Regions:
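Core AdoMet radical
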Residues: 47-60, 69-92, 101-119, 123-156, ...
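Conserved strand-turn element in the central/C-terminal portion of the radical SAM core barrel
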Residues: 158-183
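A general structural detector for well-ordered alpha-helical segments in enzyme core domains, enriched
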Residues: 62-65, 93-98, 119, 154-161, ...
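Electropositive phosphate-/nucleotide-binding environments in soluble metabolic enzymes
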Residues: 2-5, 56-63, 152, 186
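N-terminal [4Fe-4S]-dependent radical SAM core
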Residues: 1-39, 43-54
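Gly/Ala-rich phosphate-binding loop of Rossmann-like dinucleotide-binding domains
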Residues: 34, 102, 163
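Helix C-cap/helix->beta junction micro-motif
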Residues: 14-15, 104, 165
Length: 191
């Protein structure tokens, strides 16, 4: 715990000296394929993040939005949304629309939640370049925050599935996710 405090202090000091602000909107917006819907309604977000995203709740709406982004010079987008009770983004109905966006040259990142090999392969085949994967390192945090019966290894498995499918897998480690307490973050770094 003491070592973690030292590392956090050092990270804060460095961020004050070298922090660059990147504002992706409007050239790289976040799009929710579920609108404001999320079965998890977890303690991490409580559907709040979904409110700030553009909504494209059907494959047709998503395709139109992606084509508009392409025609207006956007770089790409983050594809996200609410999760099922199993911690998964219901992306399968949207894969053809995503492929169309990729064919138009959009660079897309997805926040898919937990994924199996087949889904990871389908996401990669749709032309997405990267996947952002939450990496909680404490099973109790996963249960308390997300309400999932999953463990850190399930997130590692998702990351490996996405990486092996050809996507750039980007781990997200949220410090203090467990109600502000630091639990499992160092473990997540070692996974």
């Amino acid at each position: 715990e003491e070592r973690l405090d030292e590392l956090l202090d050092e990270a804060w000091s460095v961020s004050r000296r070298r922090l660059r602000v990147y504002r992706p909107y409007p050239r790289y917006p976040s799009i929710s394929i579920t609108g404001g819907w999320c079965e998890l309604d977890c303690r991490h977000c409580g559907r709040v993040y979904l409110r700030s995203m553009e909504w494209a709740e059907s494959p047709e709406l998503l395709e139109r939005r992606l084509l508009k982004l392409s025609s207006t010079g956007a770089v790409g987008c983050l594809v996200s949304g609410g999760y099922t009770r199993e911690g998964r983004l219901p992306v399968k109905p949207f894969l053809k629309a995503l492929r169309r966006g990729a064919d138009e040259g959009l660079r897309m990142n997805i926040h898919p939640g937990l994924v199996d090999r087949k889904t990871a392969s389908e996401i990669a085949s749709a032309g997405l370049e990267a996947a952002s994967v939450d990496m909680p390192g404490d099973p109790e945090t996963i249960r308390w925050v997300h309400g999932l019966d999953a463990g850190p290894r399930d997130y590692v498995r998702s990351m490996l599935n996405l990486s092996q499918a050809g996507l750039r897998a980007c781990p997200h480690i949220c410090v203090g996710l467990h109600g502000g307490a630091v639990r499992g973050e160092l473990n997540a770094l070692s996974l």
